[in-house]
């Protein structure tokens, strides 16, 4: 499942993202954040983090540096295994 989600994000980045202006308020961008979250935390928690991030990316949020958490959920030892 994680691989399918990663392919969808890569499709978005390759074909859809160039058609619109750069509007992401965060670093890394929301799509880069989603890829890293999926690779680090697997399909379920990575998707959860990515959706939360996209919902925060709006004109009323100041944005800024927002890295993917190393441990998520708190106390999780390793990422990627589901």
From Swiss-Prot:
How does the record classify its membrane topology?
Peripheral membrane protein
Q: What are the protein's UniProt keywords?
A: Cell inner membrane, Cell membrane, Membrane
Q: List the disulfide bonds.
A: none
Localization annotation: Cell inner membrane
Q: Which Pfam families match?
A: YidD (PF01809)
According to the UniProt record, one GO cellular component term is: plasma membrane
Kindly give the InterPro entries that the UniProt entry links to this protein.
Answer: Membr_insert_effic_factor_YidD
Per the database entry, which stretches of residues form a coiled coil? none
The UniProt entry, under SMART domains, shows: Haemolytic (SM01234)
Q: What is its main location?
A: membrane
| PANTHER family in the record | MEMBRANE PROTEIN INSERTION EFFICIENCY FACTOR-RELATED
Function of this protein?
Could be involved in insertion of integral membrane proteins into the membrane.
Read off the NCBIfam families from this record.
membrane protein insertion efficiency factor YidD
- Into which family does the record put it? Belongs to the UPF0161 family.
Please identify the protein, giving its name as recorded.
Putative membrane protein insertion efficiency factor
Origin species, per record, is Thermus thermophilus (strain ATCC 27634 / DSM 579 / HB8)
